[in-house]
Amino acid sequence: MSNIHPTAIVDSSASIHESVVIGPYSVIGPEVNIAADCELRSHVIINGPSNIGTGNKFFSFCVVGEDTPDLKYQGEKTTLEVGKNNTFREFCKVHRGTGADLGYTKIGDNNLIMPGVMIAHDCVLGNNNILVDNSGLAGHVKLGDHVTLGGYTLIHQFCQLGSYSFTGLGAQITMDVPAFTRVAGNPTKQAGLNSIGLERKDFSKGEISNLKKAYKIFFREGLKVNDALGKIRSECEQNDSVQVFIQSIENS
């Protein structure tokens, strides 16, 4: 208990690993489970039911695991599930799920959630994503892995962003974004393959070239969806990355 500041408030039903550090004026509500090696700076609020994995860091004035303001929510028991080694910077907000959909909000591992980011009810985030300052995810949004949201990106309900996709500053996402692609501008439009991001993630030149070919077939040749996917299957090397690209479109 020596790692809990005397001004912090921890509900008696919360389960806190002995290695967790809880800073001044933080509040941990009922049915919150926090695993080892987490750190809460000052004025952090975590409500439950919430399960927080190992090695997460919460900076000042985060509000995590709170009831959603969605009007469908009628006080039913829902949860927040957080994986390991995520960073939640100042003033970000994460709401639990609703009974009308998943019943939970889920965040994977190694995500960087920057100041002012809003993650609404029933969202699902994969791993290694970067959500830049003041991005907003409406309810039911899904992100794959290694997604980067530019600052002030707004994502409409039920949209899906595939792995390794990238959004420009102030993008307004109202449709799904396929894996490996970039969107930018206002109104927001496709802006090409996320080539620089793929290079930084150590994709080979051959993989990137193959994805560019698939991208051009789908977005530049004016084909119907099924025809474009058929042409990608017949003319592009069917490696893992192309399969992910195809699946992100088929699951849209």
Please describe what each predicted stretch is.
Residues 1-7, 12-13, 18-19, 55, ...:
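Terminal amphipathic alpha-helical/low-complexity segments used for targeting or macromolecular assembly
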Residues 3-189:
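Structural signal for interior beta-strand "rungs" in well-ordered beta-sheet cores
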